[in-house]
Amino acid sequence: MGKYFSKDKSKYMLYTVSHPMDGYYWIRHADRGSVPLAILMVILFAVSFSANRLLASFVVNDIDPRAVDSLYELMGVLAFYLILCVSNWSVTCLMNGEGRMKDIAIAVGYGTVPITVMMTVSTIISQVIADDEQAFYGLLLGAGIVYGLIMILIGIMQVHNYTLGKTLLTLFITFIALLLSLIHISEPTRH
């Protein structure tokens, strides 16, 4: 357990957030990442997502807190994470990707860190902003989401040793595979 959540692994995750190109390269080539730590980051993302929906001020949040089921959202985020990783691995196996399943899981998991941080900060800030300051909330949340998506893009690109164009094509096909998987899972079985 200590080797997965060691101080070095945690520091390297933060290094990857601040230096994504170099960080993701060494995750693939020197086995520096940690899958359990990446899964923990996805769980923390799910918690911050639910907390934002439950606790953000009424100024920025029009969701009825009684309608939020945090456990259901946690399971949904974890299922989406699993299906995304499997879909990407399946597509990249056919497109000569060099990444392993664990590398993909780490790349996506570490990519959620900036989103989690900014979502938590936005939730806290939402408690003290006025109606005409909603743009600051949106800016913080948007910056975290954009940086997180850029990190995931860079992570997939580095893990599979792809060009930007091939990475974008692969991610497009991955999302088609993900949608097909979700449709198949949600469709009732016919006898």
Task: Map each language-model feature to its residues.
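Low-complexity, intrinsically disordered extramembrane tails and loops of integral membrane proteins
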Residues: 1-8, 187
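Selected alpha-helical membrane-embedding segments in polytopic membrane proteins
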Residues: 5-102
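A short structural micro-motif
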Residues: 45-46, 176-178
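Structural signal for membrane-spanning alpha-helices in multi-pass inner-membrane proteins
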Residues: 49-53, 119, 182
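Selective recognition of hydrophobic, aromatic-rich stretches within alpha-helical transmembrane segments
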Residues: 66-90, 106-177
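Residue-level detector of conserved catalytic or cofactor/ligand-binding positions
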Residues: 180-191
